[in-house]
A protein has these predicted regions:
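Hydrophobic h-region of N-terminal signal peptides that target proteins for export
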Residues: 16-21
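Sec-dependent signal peptide cleavage junction
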Residues: 23-27
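Predominantly extracellular/luminal regions of secreted and cell-surface proteins
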Residues: 414-440
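Glycan-processing catalytic domains of CAZymes
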Residues: 28-413
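Flexible, active-site-proximal loop/turn residues at the rims of small-molecule/cofactor binding pockets
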Residues: 14, 134, 271, 342, ...
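Aromatic, loop-rich ligand-recognition surfaces of beta-strand-rich domains
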Residues: 433-436, 440-501, 514-553
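Solvent-exposed serine/threonine-rich low-complexity stretches and specific carbohydrate-binding patches
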Residues: 502-510
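N-terminal secretory signal peptides and thylakoid transit peptides that target proteins
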Residues: 1-15
Length: 553
């Protein structure tokens, strides 16, 4: 796993004398696929066991990729909203707040990348910068596969893309980055959706000059790579330290010539600002002189805009991000780089994120978008990015007042647990384990039928005819309740006497590793007041057993 980009190297270095600059790149560029556009940084680096990827592991979901993500083994600062993904992988987290299982996606599935690029098109993200870390090791094959998915999805949805090399911990970068471009990545420039600027294919190299052990390269090594790429006829972007111009703090000295030989500069900002006042301070003291220096040299300037670290409560329901858009547009920046599209590892993602704790694993500690008390739709930061892009392009008047509403309707979600605390019935019970214990919200109390006789059933009166959409069934989360399969059918009735089977008898696996929880989807259009579960088998104990029964609708 790569070194995090988050780290802010706060110890200031003495200001060095700027190295001699190379020939300026020429006049600032006209609009193209990065100038005048919103570019989103796309990691595309998640995988899951069972996705048929070369890694066959939980890439970037877990610290230990061999084990599923769990409360004690994960690499996340934020949780994804999984609603739109067609393929989902169960984790070892407990159920979500709404009772559904906690699942994640894999970028090795084309459908995942297709969902992401569909969002980009729908919400006005013009261009995606696909991050490409050292491709020569064990991660190379899956990165190659994801790159092919990105091209296919970009072409399907009309979104531009380019390769963005990240040289973090790539010690043999100087020769290998050239070989990778020549032998593999250059072929992608034949795509009609490969980004071009000034008639040249776009490439970014991120990480030259950073003052940390993960990027130990000399100015000479970096200048060689810059000159080589420019010799290949590309438009070259430099992902550079925040303080590139003065070569202090997060920048090594003697890199001034390297920085000033790129066609475009995109200084990193994650970990540097966390509120509106920080954004204003950087606008005055860093971004404004940066822009002036780039204008003087004919270099395009692409500052970062970030939604804010959700885990650190930086977002201020969009005000933090909008202030950055306002500051960068009034500055006259040539383009904007969103950091990042899908960075759930650092909680800086604009991709869909749960609105409330209903979409977060219970007890995980992850925050939802309503963490400051303001409801925000799961797509809010995608919509905010779209509006920021319109302001950049002059389609929306420059304004310091955020025009994007956190929600598109004032009506909150109405889905609720229809069975909570409702009257229950049963075919039988053992000792004091009555059916009422299945709807009492206590995960450790449970109903158990008479032993040794099947079928058995448990029913609940919803109080009125309703439209239940799904059921969430649980056994106690204690590991002592070992894995078992219960065969269950679902029956429904309007009057409590004539029941119809709406879901046939099916074996459902209850496993402590996944919270001992099962979700049953109900037929669309179902209308009922009384619902019943009919148990006809249990591999773990000769009885029907149920600790929590939620009926959502």
């Amino acid at each position: 796993m790569s070194l995090s980009r988050r780290t802010f190297l706060g110890s200031a270095l003495a200001v060095s004398t700027l190295a001699a600059t190379s020939t300026p790149a020429g006049a600032a560029s006209p609009p193209g696929d990065v100038v005048g556009k919103i570019t989103v940084g796309y990691q595309g680096w998640f995988a899951a066991r069972g996705d048929n990827s070369p890694l066959n592991g939980w890439w970037h979901w877990s610290d230990n990729w061999g084990e599923p993500p769990s409360p004690t083994n994960h690499a996340l600062q934020s949780w994804p909203d999984m609603t739109d993904y067609p393929t989902k992988y169960p984790t070892a987290f407990g159920a979500l707040g709404n009772g559904q299982p906690a699942t994640v996606f894999s970028n090795h599935d084309y459908q995942t990348v297709d969902v992401h690029f569909r969002w980009m098109r729908e919400y006005g993200c013009d261009t995606a910068a696909l991050q490409r870390f050292n491709p020569t090791g064990g991660e190379g094959p899956i990165r190659d596969a994801v790159t092919a998915h990105v091209r296919r999805a970009a072409e399907a949805h009309g979104v531009k893309f380019y390769i963005m090399y990240d040289v973090t911990n790539w010690t043999t970068m100087q020769s290998e980055i050239k070989a990778d471009w020549t032998n593999k990545m250059r072929a992608y420039t034949s795509s009609p959706m490969y980004a071009r600027q000034n008639g040249k294919p776009v490439v970014c190299v991120w990480g030259f000059g950073f003052n940390d052990p993960g990027r130990p390269f000399t100015p000479q090594q970096c200048q060689d790579v810059v000159d080589w790429f420019k010799g290949q006829g590309v438009y070259l972007i430099g992902g550079v330290p925040t303080h590139w111009r003065r070569e202090v703090e997060d920048s090594r000295p003697d890199f001034g010539g390297v920085y000033r030989s790129f066609h475009m500069l995109s200084p990193w900002m994650v970990g540097r600002i966390g509120n509106v006042a920080d954004s204003d301070h950087f606008h005055t003291n860093v971004n404004t002189p940066d822009q002036a220096e780039c204008d003087r040299l004919g270099i395009d300037y692409q500052p970062c805009v970030l939604p804010g670290d959700l885990a650190r409560r930086h977002r201020a329901h969009g005000d933090f991000m909008w202030r950055q858009f306002y500051n960068m547009v009034r500055l006259g920046a040539q383009g904007i780089y969103i950091s990042m599209f899908d960075e759930y590892n650092e909680a800086n993602q604009i991709a869909k994120t749960p609105e409330t704790q209903a979409g977060i694993p219970v007890g995980s500690g992850f925050l939802a978008l309503d963490e400051d008390g303001t409801r925000c739709s799961s797509d809010y930061y995608l919509r905010l990015t779209g509006d920021g892009g319109r302001m950049l392009k002059g389609q929306l008047a420059l304004t310091a007042v955020r025009p994007t509403k956190p929600v598109l309707t004032d009506t909150p979600p109405v889905e609720r647990d229809l069975a909570a605390g409702r009257p229950t019935t049963q075919s039988s019970q053992t000792q004091h384990y009555g059916s009422h214990l299945a709807v009492d919200a206590d995960p450790n109390t449970y109903w158990e039928s008479a032993n040794g006789v099947f079928p058995q059933w448990i029913g609940v009166d919803l109080g009125a005819v309703a439209a239940p959409r799904r059921m969430v069934l649980s056994l106690p989360p204690n590991p002592a309740w070992g894995r078992r399969t219960q065969t269950i059918a679902v029956e429904a009735s309007a009057d409590g006497s004539a029941f119809t089977t709406v879901s046939p008898a099916t074996g459902h696996v209850f496993d402590p590793a996944t919270g001992n929880t099962v979700t049953l989807a109900l037929p669309a259009g179902l209308s009922a007041r009384h619902v019943r579960l009919r148990f006809s088998g249990n591999t773990g104990w000769p009885a029907g057993q149920l600790a929590r029964w939620q009926v959502w609708g």
